[in-house]
C-alpha cells in the first residue's frame, strides 16, 4: 500500500471514509520514540514509522517523559472512520535501556492477558500479536543499535474499560485490549477483518476441544440457546451475516456438527442459497416464503398477502392465521439441504441442523426434533 493509497478514502455506499492506523502501529511508534528519547535525552514530539504494508506514518507524540535511562511516550489511536472500540485512546510505551543486548517486551496496565489456546500466543502472555511484536522489537532495535538491550512495556490506561466493547473476553483475552494489526492500517468497515475476528473465535472453540458448534446471527440467538435449549453457550459462535464463510471455516477446522440457530428473517435466506445475509447483498425473504408456501399448497390469497409484506414478522402473522406454521420445519430442512449442497465436495461433511425461533423466543421449526439436537450438543 503506497502513501497515496493510504491518504485516498475508501468508498462505501457513496461515502468517502478515512483510513486509520492500528493499535500495533501506535505501540510501535510509542516504543520507537521512547527509545530515541532515552538515547538523545530530550523530548520528541513527532515520530515516523513504516507499517508492515509499506506506508510511512508520521504521528504526534503525547505525554513524553524522560527519567534517566527510562522514557515514556504515547500515541493516540486513530481508527479513521471505522467502527473502532479503541479509537481516540492513548497507547503508551515505557522503554528502559540496559546492557543485556536483548529486547524484552511485556504488556502492562490495560493490555489483555491470553487465557485460552487458539489466538497464536502463549497462555499467560500479553495480548500483543505476532506482527506488532515484530514491528515493536524492530523499531526499538533500530533506535538503540545492535549492542544495547531494552525492557519495553506497552500499556493503555483505558484498556480494561475499552476492552468491554470488543470480542476479547469471548476469545479468552482478559483485562484489557489487544495490540493487533497485520498491515498497520485500519480500513474502514473492513469486512475481511470482521470475518477474521469471528473465525478466530471458532478456532479458539476448536482448540479447547469442542467438536460441535452453534452458529447464530447475533445476541438474540445466543440467548435463545441458553434459555430455550438448555445448552451451554460455550458452543455458540456469532456468524453475523457471513453464513457461508463461517460454515466453511467450521468445516476447515474439523467440526463434526454445525447447528444454525436464528430468526427466520435471517435464516430463510439460506433456504434460497443466499449465504451472505446482509440486505445490501440480497433479500428474497418474501420470494422464498412465497415459493415454499406454494410448494406446500398454500392458497393464492396467502401467497399474495405474504408477497406484499415488508417484514418477516408481518408475513409470519399471515402464515399463522392460515395455519401454515409447518412451513418452518420445511424451511429448516431446506436450509440444511442448501448447506450440504454447498459442502458437497467435502470428504467428511459435518452434520447440519437448523432451528428457527420467533422474536419472543418460541421455537418455530427445525429439521429434526430440537430435543434430539440439544442432546447431541451436550455430548
UniProtKB/Swiss-Prot annotation:
Metabolic or biological pathway, per its Swiss-Prot or TrEMBL entry: Cofactor biosynthesis; adenosylcobalamin biosynthesis; cob(II)yrinate a,c-diamide from sirohydrochlorin (anaerobic route): step 6/10
Catalyses: Co-precorrin-5B + S-adenosyl-L-methionine = Co-precorrin-6A + S-adenosyl-L-homocysteine
Its EC number is: 2.1.1.195
One of the record's GO molecular function terms: cobalt-precorrin-5B C1-methyltransferase activity
Q: Which GO terms describe its biological process?
A: anaerobic cobalamin biosynthetic process; methylation
The UniProt keywords, alphabetically, are: Cobalamin biosynthesis, Methyltransferase, S-adenosyl-L-methionine, Transferase
Looking up Pfam families in the UniProt record yields:
CbiD
Q: Does the keyword Lyase apply?
A: no
Enzyme superclass (EC) = transferase
| Top-level taxon in the UniProt lineage | Bacteria
Keyword Nucleus attributed: no
Q: Which family does it belong to?
A: Belongs to the CbiD family.
Protein name, please? Cobalt-precorrin-5B C(1)-methyltransferase
Q: Which organism is it from?
A: Salmonella paratyphi A (strain AKU_12601)
GN (gene name): cbiD
Amino acid at each position: 500500500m503506497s502513501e497515496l493509497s493510504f491518504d485516498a478514502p475508501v468508498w462505501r455506499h457513496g461515502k468517502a471514509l478515512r483510513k486509520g492506523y492500528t493499535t500495533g502501529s501506535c505501540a510501535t511508534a510509542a516504543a520507537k520514540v521512547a527509545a530515541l528519547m532515552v538515547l538523545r535525552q530530550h523530548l520528541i514530539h513527532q515520530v515516523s514509522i513504516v507499517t508492515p504494508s509499506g506506508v510511512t506514518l508520521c504521528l504526534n507524540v503525547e505525554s513524553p517523559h524522560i527519567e534517566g535511562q527510562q522514557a515514556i511516550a504515547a500515541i493516540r489511536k486513530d481508527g479513521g472512520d471505522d467502527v473502532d472500540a479503541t479509537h481516540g485512546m492513548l497507547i503508551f510505551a515505557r522503554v528502559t535501556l540496559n546492557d543485556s543486548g536483548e529486547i524484552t517486551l511485556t504488556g502492562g496496565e490495560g493490555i489483555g492477558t491470553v487465557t485460552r489456546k487458539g489466538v497464536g500466543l502463549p497462555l499467560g502472555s500479553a495480548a500483543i500479536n505476532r506482527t506488532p511484536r515484530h514491528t515493536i522489537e524492530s523499531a526499538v532495535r533500530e533506535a538503540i543499535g545492535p549492542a544495547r538491550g531494552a525492557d519495553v512495556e506497552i500499556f493503555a490506561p483505558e484498556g480494561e474499560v475499552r476492552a468491554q466493547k470488543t470480542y476479547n473476553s469471548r476469545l479468552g483475552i482478559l483485562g484489557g485490549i489487544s495490540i493487533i494489526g497485520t498491515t498497520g492500517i485500519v480500513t474502514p468497515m473492513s469486512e475481511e477483518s470482521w470475518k477474521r475476528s469471528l473465525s478466530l473465535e471458532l478456532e479458539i472453540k476448536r482448540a479447547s476441544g469442542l467438536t460441535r458448534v452453534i452458529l447464530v446471527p447475533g445476541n438474540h440467538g445466543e440467548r435463545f440457546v441458553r434459555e430455550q435449549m438448555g445448552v451451554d453457550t460455550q458452543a455458540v459462535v456469532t456468524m453475523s451475516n457471513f453464513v457461508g464463510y463461517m460454515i466453511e471455516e467450521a468445516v476447515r477446522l474439523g467440526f463434526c456438527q454445525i447447528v444454525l440457530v436464528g430468526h427466520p428473517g435471517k435464516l430463510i435466506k439460506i433456504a434460497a442459497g443466499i449465504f451472505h445475509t446482509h440486505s445490501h447483498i440480497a433479500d428474497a425473504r418474501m420470494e422464498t416464503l412465497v415459493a415454499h408456501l406454494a410448494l406446500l399448497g398454500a392458497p393464492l390469497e396467502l401467497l399474495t398477502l405474504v408477497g406484499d409484506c415488508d417484514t418477516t414478522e408481518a408475513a409470519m402473522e399471515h402464515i399463522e392465521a392460515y395455519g401454515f406454521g409447518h412451513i418452518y420445519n420445511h424451511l429448516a430442512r431446506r436450509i440444511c439441504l442448501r448447506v450440504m449442497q454447498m459442502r458437497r465436495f467435502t470428504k467428511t461433511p459435518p452434520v447440519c441442523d437448523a432451528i428457527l425461533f420467533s422474536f419472543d423466543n418460541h421455537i418455530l421449526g427445525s429439521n429434526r426434533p430440537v430435543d434430539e439436537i440439544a442432546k447431541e450438543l451436550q455430548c
